[in-house]
Structure formats: C-alpha cells, structure tokens
Design a protein with these regions (language model features):
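N-terminal strand-loop element at the rim of the active site
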Residues: 2-53, 143-146, 159
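Membrane-proximal helix-turn-helix segments that form the acceptor-binding/catalytic region
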Residues: 12-14, 61, 116-136
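Donor nucleotide-sugar binding/catalytic pocket of nucleotide-sugar-dependent glycosyltransferases
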Residues: 40, 126-169
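Glycine-rich phosphate-binding loop signature in dinucleotide/nucleotide-binding domains
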Residues: 65-71
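Active-site proximal beta-strand in glycosyltransferases
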Residues: 72, 90-108, 136-137, 155-158
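Short His-centered aromatic/hydrophobic patch
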Residues: 75-81, 101-102
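Short acidic, glycine/proline-rich loop/turn micro-motifs
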Residues: 109-113
C-alpha cells in the first residue's frame, strides 16, 4: 500500500504546497521514499492477508483518534475504506473523508466465499459508507454504478483518471 502512495500519488503531494500530507499505510518497501513526500508517515499495523483484521482496525482507530476537523482523510481502495469505516465506528467523526475506489476487488468477485461475505456485510456497508464518507471517487463508471447501487450511497461520487496502470480487456 505504501507503493500506491509513492508511485501514483507523490506528484500530487509534491505539487500542493499549502497543505501538509500524512501517509498512513502498512509499510512494505517504500517507507523511506514515503518520508520524502509526506510530512509524517505512520505504519498502520495490518495483516493484509486477513479479510477482516480486528487488530488492524483497532490499530487504525488509535491512529485516527488524534485527527481533527481541519484534516481530510483520503482513503484508497475499497478494503481500506471499509476498514477505516469500522475503525471510525462509534466515533464522533470530525474529519472530512474521501474514498477512492480503485477497483471493486475480492468482495465483488465470482468467488463463492466473497459472495457470502458480500451478503453478510451488506447491511454494515450500506450504513458505514454513507455515515463515513463525504464523497466517493472511482476510476470507471461501471464500478461507480455497481457500488453506488449496492451501498445505496446517497452522497456525491465522481469519476477520476486512473492511476496509470493499464489493464487489458
């Protein structure tokens, strides 16, 4: 996840001088490079191999508790967004939160377990996404239509250019 912040977001962060950016993500190999672009970097201890990492959510909750109303939280990927929403549960949310869905991923795959998980999480997703995110951004219209319908999202959503990774159809 630190790769996304260094490879596809560093140019944006480098060119906005009137704001300070903090990177909160699990560190892999780009921790030092993150420090070159972000004012502060925080290693979000998360087991990315788990579908639902309770300790990772608790760790994120401890990180975000110190954010204030001036802060904007921009979350990348649907999985990170859902984990953020669970971490933000029962908090008096003071921040403006944006979710960029870079793809629908495992939850919307044809995998049998994913289909069951999607049904089980449906109730929570509908409430948590609407409660936690001021707007959603997508990289394609099909994902926007699919997820907005599934989550019954009632806020604004936008299409943005892709992060530069070419996908063969």
């Amino acid at each position: 996840w630190d790769w996304i912040l260094t490879q596809s977001r560093k140019d944006i962060v480098s060119n906005i001088n009137d704001s300070k950016f903090m990177a909160i993500c699990p560190f892999d190999q780009n921790e030092i490079e993150l420090g070159n672009y972000y004012k502060e970097t925080i290693d979000w201890k998360l087991n990315r191999n788990k579908i639902f990492d309770f300790w990772g959510i608790k760790n994120l909750r401890n990180i975000i508790k110190d954010l204030n109303s001036d802060d904007i939280v921009h979350v990348f990927t649907l999985k990170s967004g859902l984990l953020f929403a669970f971490a933000n549960l029962f908090r008096n949310n003071k921040t403006k939160n944006i979710l960029t869905i870079t793809g629908l991923g495992y939850l919307f795959s044809d995998n049998f377990k994913a289909k069951i998980l999607k049904i089980l999480l449906g109730f929570f997703i509908k409430r948590l996404v609407n409660k936690n995110f001021d707007f959603l951004m997508y990289q394609n219209g099909e994902d926007q239509k699919t997820f907005n319908n599934y989550s019954k999202y009632n806020g604004e959503s936008f299409i943005i250019p892709t992060s530069g990774i070419t996908v063969k159809e």
